[in-house]
């Protein structure tokens, strides 16, 4: 029996898994830029940054595993996509970045040690071994994250959130940057899209499905019911958090001058509110947020790769990916960000369209036709966005692409992909007659 307590614990686990350190440091800059339009901007941010991943989570939980999204593609294409996805969000890019965020934004500001390659290595080893201890057995992930880490993280965030609304640092100023020129809702939508949490939802859907299975919940209708209930808990928590972080950014003019990212704004704000204690609060929030995401993502990666061979079990992959994360994290945060974003720009649109295709799959007259052509077009246009980010896109292609809607926002793929899907449906109906 799945009790109300189980739903709340599962919902808190989902919340913590999605709440990486990046999700905490990104909204304050958006709130600062949105100014007195912060509330509208935060609504747009929540739609694409919270609701889209929530829908993906429900879809994947019903399917049972993220790889079921690719079942209508050629096997090589599905395996290639999922391998790239798990490596990008896992130990090749995102998890080393998470380790570096914890080191540079939580550990170093405490002033306990000097920054050096040796210090970074020691921190990375200890941090990742602690995470590995929580996930070496897959059955402990939900209890560890949902019952232990999340409550501690929520307490710290609640203290900051309440204080921000009770004692804001500054008056809210006029919007700037993209928010001064465009609709706050639209800009917020694009900003929420850039969290790219749909990728994480594909990985975490399997964790939710296994958590439900452990409670003997296998009926598809019950899976949908409980996933929506638990997911709703996480949606409320994430929505409230983003709302508070946008307000923090909007009222940060006194400390935001010269800040280059939301992490700096968040850190300065917390330090201004709490003094020396603020540094420790910041360290606690970033450490717990980083740890929960590291545990969830690496666990999902280990589960996926363990299916390829009985010789290499889940514990083997956890140890392997932990070692890989530790080694790659020595390259530093700046270098990792430089290669992470182009990789994400390449696979994120594919992930979104796979979810869209799954949602309408039963209505497609020719499933294979729609999947093949829609994903092919999505790959082509997402490759353009990726090459543009690397500054290696040929000038001739750039001159053509500037005429496409949303190209400047990194969303050149969206309209062509949706149009291709519609055309494939019409063609499928014609062929089936």
Predicted regions mapped to residue ranges:
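Hydrophobic, membrane-embedded alpha-helices of multi-pass small-molecule transporters
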Residues: 9-19, 127, 163-170, 179-245, ...
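Selective recognition of specific alpha-helical transmembrane segments in multi-pass small-molecule
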Residues: 51, 55, 152-164, 198-200, ...
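Membrane-water interface regions at transmembrane-helix termini and the short interhelical loops
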Residues: 61-68, 127-149, 214-217, 327-339, ...
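TM-loop-TM module centered on a large, flexible mid-protein loop between adjacent transmembrane helices
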Residues: 67-71, 241-291, 298, 342
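Hydrophobic alpha-helical segments and their helix-loop junctions in multi-pass secondary transporters
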Residues: 91, 95, 154-180, 198, ...
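Membrane-interface loop-to-helix entry segments
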Residues: 134-164, 340-352, 371-379
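Hydrophobic, small-residue-rich membrane helices and short re-entrant helix-turn-helix hairpins
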Residues: 137-148, 185-188, 208-237, 254-267, ...
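A generic transmembrane alpha-helix motif of multi-pass inner-membrane proteins
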Residues: 167, 367-433
């Amino acid at each position: 029996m799945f009790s109300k307590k189980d739903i709340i614990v599962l919902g808190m686990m989902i919340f913590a898994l999605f709440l990486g350190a990046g999700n905490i440091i990104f909204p304050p800059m958006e709130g600062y830029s949105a100014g007195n339009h912060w509330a509208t901007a935060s609504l747009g941010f929540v739609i694409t940054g919270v609701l889209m991943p929530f829908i993906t989570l429900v879809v994947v939980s019903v399917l049972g595993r993220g790889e079921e999204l690719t079942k209508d593609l050629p096997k090589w294409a599905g395996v290639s996509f999922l391998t790239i996805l798990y490596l990008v969000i896992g130990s090749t890019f995102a998890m080393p970045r998470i380790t570096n965020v914890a080191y540079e934004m939580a550990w170093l500001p405490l002033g306990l040690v000097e920054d050096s390659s040796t210090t970074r290595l020691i921190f990375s080893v200890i941090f990742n071994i602690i995470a590995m201890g929580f996930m070496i057995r897959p059955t402990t992930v939900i209890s560890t994250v949902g019952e232990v880490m999340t409550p501690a993280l929520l307490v710290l965030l609640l203290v900051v959130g309440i204080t921000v609304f009770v004692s804001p640092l500054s008056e809210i100023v006029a919007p700037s940057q993209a928010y001064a020129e465009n609709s706050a809702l639209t800009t917020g939508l694009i900003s929420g899209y850039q969290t790219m949490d749909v990728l994480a939802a594909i990985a975490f859907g399997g964790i939710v499905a296994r958590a439900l299975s452990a409670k003997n919940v296998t009926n598809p209708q019950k899976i949908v019911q409980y996933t929506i209930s638990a997911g709703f808990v996480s949606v409320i928590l994430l929505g409230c958090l983003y709302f508070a972080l946008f307000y923090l950014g909007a009222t940060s003019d006194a400390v935001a001058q010269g800040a280059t990212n939301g992490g700096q704004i968040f850190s300065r704000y917390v330090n201004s509110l709490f003094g020396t204690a603020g540094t420790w609060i910041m360290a606690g929030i970033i450490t717990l947020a980083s740890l929960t995401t590291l545990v969830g993502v690496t666990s999902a990666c280990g589960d996926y790769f363990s299916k390829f061979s009985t010789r290499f079990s889940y514990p083997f992959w956890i140890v392997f990916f932990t070692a890989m994360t530790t080694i790659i994290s020595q390259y530093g945060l700046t270098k990792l960000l430089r290669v992470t974003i182009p990789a994400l720009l390449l696979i994120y649109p594919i992930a979104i369209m796979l979810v869209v295709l799954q949602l309408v799959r039963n209505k497609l007259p020719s499933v294979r036709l729609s999947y093949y052509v829609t994903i092919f077009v999505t790959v082509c246009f997402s490759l353009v966005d990726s090459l543009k980010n690397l500054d290696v896109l040929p000038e001739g292609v750039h001159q053509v692409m500037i005429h496409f809607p949303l190209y400047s926002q990194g969303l050149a793929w969206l309209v062509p992909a949706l149009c291709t899907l519609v055309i494939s449906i019409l063609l499928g109906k014609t062929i089936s007659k």
